[in-house]
């Protein structure tokens, strides 16, 4: 469960390292965002000499959360960290690599480019 002011790791090589959520896209008064939701975030930590810089406002899709994800078949998935992938306005990832495992639910939400870049899909 991601809410405003939550810090997230970045799971791609776009140049950002840490994000802070400031808004959940598509929700006027939703409190929490889950896996597959798009958020507006500010970059809190970045790699030097990369296109993305600190204090830049970007969009990102959540790919991992510490809160459990319950599937219809009874499977429960929990990750060790909260992580997101930086995307552009069309929903394509800004980075060329994705690190770590991501959930299968992203494929159903039309983030197929992110799923194809991921090394492991759970």
UniProtKB/Swiss-Prot annotation:
GO terms under biological process: translation
PROSITE patterns: RIBOSOMAL_L14
SUPFAM superfamilies, per database record: Ribosomal protein L14 (SSF50193)
One of the record's GO molecular function terms: structural constituent of ribosome
Compartments (UniProt record): Plastid, Chloroplast
Keyword annotations of the record: Chloroplast, Plastid, Ribonucleoprotein, Ribosomal protein, RNA-binding, rRNA-binding
Matches recorded under InterPro entries: Ribosomal_uL14, Ribosomal_uL14_bac-type, Ribosomal_uL14_CS, Ribosomal_uL14_sf
One cellular component (GO) term of this entry: chloroplast
Keyword Protein biosynthesis (UniProt): no
SMART domains: Ribosomal_L14
Principal localisation: plastid
Protein role: Binds to 23S rRNA.
Sequence similarity: Belongs to the universal ribosomal protein uL14 family.
Complexes and interactors: Part of the 50S ribosomal subunit.
NCBIfam families: rplN_bact
Name under which the protein is recorded: Large ribosomal subunit protein uL14c
Organism: Buxus microphylla
């Amino acid at each position: 469960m991601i809410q405003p002011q939550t810090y997230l790791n970045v799971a791609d090589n776009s140049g950002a390292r840490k994000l802070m959520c400031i808004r959940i896209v598509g929700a006027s008064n939703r409190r929490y965002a889950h896996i597959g939701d798009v958020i507006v975030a500010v970059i809190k930590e970045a790699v030097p000499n990369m296109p993305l810089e600190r204090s830049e406002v970007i969009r990102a899709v959540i790919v991992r959360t510490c809160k459990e994800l319950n599937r219809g078949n009874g499977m429960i998935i929990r990750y060790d960290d909260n992580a997101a992938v930086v995307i552009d306005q069309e929903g394509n990832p800004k980075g060329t690599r994705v690190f770590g495992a991501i959930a299968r639910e992203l494929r159903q939400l039309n983030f197929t480019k992110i799923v194809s870049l991921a090394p492991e899909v759970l």
